[in-house]
């Protein structure tokens, strides 16, 4: 008997602007063999086309599943988005604009239900939505037992800075000791937003101050790998600055662990020492290992399982 016939099943979708990554997960949070796929997103097309595309992918993955096996569908969706109610407010980004104001939960449930009726199958499952930073954080806690019974701030450092606060493996959104929704990007630091520092443009600006012109942090990382001392000092400055920005959040929250992910975290070998020096012994710093996609899918599973 196949894996998907033995256990309950969760469907996970990572809704990128260019591609949709999707997979089935079993009751243990493992990817069901042969179900992971990468599909064109059609994100610049009409709402009907996008919604039908999601439904087609889901039904294709579920083709061999028995009636009632599907326990939930989870989506990692970019914002702005009403994650609780499943409504997209993306506009002007040339991706998923056509879904603006649409209740995606209701639309997907209706399409799957209609198809199920045609095959006389019963449907009873939940559909949940969350942003990629929160799901990445949940996934990291799921993978690392050390993080499951503590207070964690998890960051994704890239074009912007995504953040999520967790306590004992659960996401916090409304808590007196954290920013609203757990989002630090819009908080103030030295008269500017945190995202102006802990992001692609923050690294580029630090490099420019040292008279190095780069278009991407990866270029500065490459220079540091090759032994360029100025590049290494810039990364050190980034780490020190990150520690100064993040330590007040950690202190107020009572955070014990800081997890770093995203493209910029790949350069952590050059900035981790300075970050840890600034942090002192107040909290531990971890750099996420493995593929970020894997953590997002693990996070979707964890979100659905917690809501079970």
Give the label of every model feature segment.
Residues 41-48, 52, 69, 81-151, ...:
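Glycine-rich phosphate-binding loop and adjoining helix at the ATP-binding site
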Residues 18-19, 135, 159-162:
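Conserved A3 ("GATE") glycine/threonine-rich loop of ANL adenylate-forming enzymes
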Residues 5-56, 60, 68, 87-92, ...:
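Short glycine-rich, Thr/Ser-proximal phosphate-binding strand/loop in the N-terminal lobe
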Residues 2, 16, 281-308:
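Conserved glycine-rich phosphate/nucleotide-binding loop
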Residues 10-14, 70-74, 152-156, 259, ...:
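Short glycine-aspartate micro-motif
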Residues 23-25, 34-36, 46-47, 99, ...:
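Glycine/GP-enriched mid-protein hinge/lid loop-to-helix segment characteristic of carbohydrate kinases
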Residues 78-81, 158-162, 264:
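Short glycine-rich anion-binding loops that position phosphate/pyrophosphate groups of nucleotides
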Residues 42-66, 192-196, 204-270, 285-296:
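Adenine-nucleotide phosphate-binding core of ATP-dependent small-molecule kinases
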């Amino acid at each position: 008997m196949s894996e998907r016939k033995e256990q309950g099943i969760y469907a996970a979708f990572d809704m990128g602007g260019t591609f949709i990554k999707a997979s089935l997960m079993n009751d243990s949070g493992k990817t069901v063999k042969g179900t992971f796929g990468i599909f064109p997103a059609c994100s610049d097309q009409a709402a009907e086309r996008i919604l039908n595309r999601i439904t087609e992918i889901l039904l294709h993955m579920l083709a061999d599943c028995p009636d009632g096996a599907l326990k939930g569908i989870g989506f990692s969706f970019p914002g702005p988005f009403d994650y609780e109610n499943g409504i997209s407010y993306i506009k002007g980004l040339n991706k998923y604009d056509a879904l603006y104001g649409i209740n995606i939960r209701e639309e997907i449930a209706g399409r799957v239900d209609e198809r199920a009726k045609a095959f006389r199958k019963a449907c009873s499952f939940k559909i949940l939505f969350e942003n990629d930073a929160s799901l990445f954080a949940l996934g990291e806690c799921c993978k690392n037992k050390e993080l499951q019974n503590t207070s964690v701030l998890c960051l994704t450092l890239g074009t912007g800075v995504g953040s999520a606060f967790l306590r004992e493996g659960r996401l916090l959104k409304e808590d007196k000791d954290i920013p609203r929704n757990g989002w630090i990007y819009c908080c103030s630091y030295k008269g500017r937003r945190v995202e102006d520092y802990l992001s692609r443009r923050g690294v580029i600006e630090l490099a420019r101050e040292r008279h190095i012109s780069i278009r991407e942090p990866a270029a500065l990382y490459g220079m540091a790998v090759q032994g360029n001392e100025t590049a290494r000092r810039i990364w050190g400055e980034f780490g020190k600055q990150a520690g100064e920005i993040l330590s007040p959040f950690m202190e107020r929250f009572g955070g014990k662990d800081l997890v770093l992910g995203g493209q910029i975290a790949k350069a952590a070998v050059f900035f981790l020492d300075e970050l840890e020096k600034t942090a002192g012994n107040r909290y531990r710093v971890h750099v996420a290992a493995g593929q970020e996609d894997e953590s997002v899918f693990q996070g979707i599973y964890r979100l659905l399982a917690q809501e079970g």
